[in-house]
Design a protein with these regions (language model features):
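Alpha/beta-hydrolase active-site loop
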Residues: 121-142
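Short beta-strand/loop motif that positions the catalytic acidic residue
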Residues: 228-229, 235-237, 241
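The serine-hydrolase catalytic nucleophile loop
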Residues: 84-97, 110
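Catalytic histidine-centered segment of alpha/beta-hydrolase-like enzymes
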Residues: 268-282
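An N-terminal hydrophobic leader/cap segment in hydrolases
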Residues: 6-58
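Conserved alpha/beta-hydrolase "acid-adjacent" motif
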Residues: 242-248
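Conserved alpha/beta-hydrolase
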Residues: 98-117
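Hydrolase active-site cap/lid region
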Residues: 161-217, 223-226, 231
């Protein structure tokens, strides 16, 4: 075989391998959940002896989301957003605590998770439509009540991004939120998959844009967080978080305006604060929303 032909075959093989690696990363990170998972059994608020109803929620791109409303005794609502590919029941612990403190609580399942319509996952880029649709449904069902957002991991990032530009939102608490998903993707490629970044991150994002229309680089909570001010922000992050390093929380805090607070939890991993010390965690979160929504969200007459 001639040298030019050998070089050509080598280049072609390398390109094919690179394309396959990009496809594998995309599939592992953003693939749809299998039907067996989407249809899995789940806990409901009834298992916590809490009354609830299902809200009709339809996103701008025509996806129906499983959504629970736990009616409270105060004229204020806290919307709880779970993590990436999370289950709606994941947030029932903190949701029940907020409900017992008098708040109405809304929990929902992201697109592509159990009970909601199937759709590709986009690490928050398209999921912002989900939270906006939930806020619309709350307005339709309960009227213009003050709303606080509590989000975990991707849910925290989405809560910051949506809350920054939605005047219906009076306060945001974000636990283990990432500052921007591109940095997070590059970190995971480098440290967890041992792959070069951004050599693979850029084509993976391009593949996502072609398949879902989501432009991950345009979803940057760290660029939006300053617009929350003067509404209060509470950031919670464990300093042993291996999924979203605590530096993400520090970046968000540095970019935010006042009033803001960063609660760093020593030795705690990803979204582990609630489980590390339920009493302290619940007290801190409820106190935050008491102060943020207190005047507007007093007891109903």
């Amino acid at each position: 075989m001639s040298r030019p032909a050998l070089v050509g075959r080598t280049v072609a093989a390398g390109a094919a391998g690179w394309a396959a690696a990009c496809g594998l990363v995309y599939w592992r990170t953003f693939r749809r959940l299998p039907r067996s998972h989407r249809d899995s059994r789940r806990l409901t608020p009834a298992d916590f002896e809490l009354a609830y109803e299902e809200l009709e929620v339809l996103t701008a791109d025509r996806l129906r989301l499983l959504t629970w409303l736990l009616p409270g005794t105060r004229d204020a609502v806290v919307v709880v957003s779970g993590g990436y590919r999370g289950h709606i029941s994941d947030v029932l612990g903190i949701g029940a605590a907020l409900r017992r403190a008098g708040f109405s609580v809304v929990a929902y399942g992201w697109r592509g998770t159990p009970g909601s319509d199937t759709a590709p996952h986009t690490l928050g880029a398209n999921e912002r439509r989900d939270l906006t649709a939930v806020l619309d449904a709350i307005g339709d069902r309960l009227g213009p009540l003050p709303i606080g957002l509590l989000g975990y991991s991707m849910g925290g990032a989405v809560s910051i991004s949506v809350g920054a530009d939605d005047p219906r939102v009076r306060a945001v608490c974000a636990d283990s939120a990432f500052a921007d998903p591109v940095t997070l993707l590059e970190e995971r490629l480098r440290h967890q998959l041992h792959l070069p970044a951004p050599v693979l991150a850029d084509p993976v994002m391009a593949l996502m844009a072609r398949r879902t229309g989501a432009r991950l680089a345009e979803f940057r909570p760290v660029a939006a967080v300053a617009r929350l001010a003067p509404r209060p922000l509470l950031l919670i992050h464990g300093d042993a978080d291996a999924s979203v390093p605590v530096e993400h929380g520090r970046r968000l805090y540095a970019a935010a305006g006042d009033p803001r607070d960063l609660w760093v939890l020593p030795g705690v991993g990803h979204v582990g604060g609630y489980f590390a010390n339920r009493t302290a965690y619940v007290e801190r979160v409820i106190d935050f929303f008491d102060r943020a929504l207190g005047e507007a969200g007093g007891p109903r007459s």
